[in-house]
Amino acid sequence: MKYHILAFGAGFLMDQIFGDPYFLPHPIRGIGWLIAKIEKVLRSGNPQENSPEREAAERRQGKLLVVIVLLLTGMFTALILVGAYALYPKIGMVVEAVMTYQILAARCLQVESGKVWKQLKAGNLEAAREAVSMIVGRDTQNLTEEGVAKAAIETVAENTSDGVIAPMLYTALGGPVLGFLYKAVNTMDSMVGYKNDRYLHFGRAAAKLDDVVNFLPARISALLMIGAAFLSGKSYNGRQAWRIWHRDSRKHASPNSAQTESVCAGALGIQLAGDASYFGKVVKKPYIGDPKRQVEYEDIRRANRLMNRTAWICELLCLGILMVVAV
């Protein structure tokens, strides 16, 4: 337990300081490569399109994808971790710290959304659209300056749970093996969990599992973010964060996505969400938050500060609980 606590804290600090070095291969990209390869193999020889047999086959294949990816991810990460600790406990601790570092994405989220902020600040709307297209799934080519800023803020808010708090909680609970299993589920959902013609049936299992594993972490993330809003000074409104979360946290097709998004909207006093275009089709969405003022590019940095303070609160709470359990 002592080594797990030290590795957990060190991994968090490494993410805060270094983020993701783009020149190095990242295990999450490896999981993405694995998902793509398995999908290609499973889909070969499918029945004719738009037939009941094809729909049933795709659902079976989607379930098999989930099982194979989770088995391989769990076995591979467990082998690395157990092997490192078998060599020498301190080597195991270092390996666990590096694995924890690779699971978390707070710094990466700040850097990528910061690129959007930088281009908007410079008045370069086209470059800002290009930058935000790297971190959102919607069509960005026709977004206004406010639309670009909103898209970046929504990504920061939603990924406070998906990319920071949820993986942190799972890693604290079960070490990097459980952390990477969570990331595998999350990556499958981001790759095949779309409700379009290609993935409606094939990605159903991954999308449903992602909803399940994020249900509690999303709500814990929202509560932690409300706490961060109360502790973050006059730029944030903790009471409004609580009110908007209570009112708007279910205004999303996903049971989890609006949890932290509603808190962020309330804390900043802005309105998020609304209709968006995906693959050329407009998707109707309810608004989240109240339009007390216009969204501006500086709100991207405010959202990032709120995300980072939420991450620190979660890290300190997890470390405290782990230390109490270890006594």
Predicted regions mapped to residue ranges:
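Glycine-rich phosphate/dinucleotide-binding loop and adjoining beta-alpha-beta core of small-molecule
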Residues: D189-S190
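Substrate/ligand-engaging "lid" and interaction regions
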Residues: N186
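Hydrophobic alpha-helical transmembrane segments
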Residues: M1-L181, G193-V327
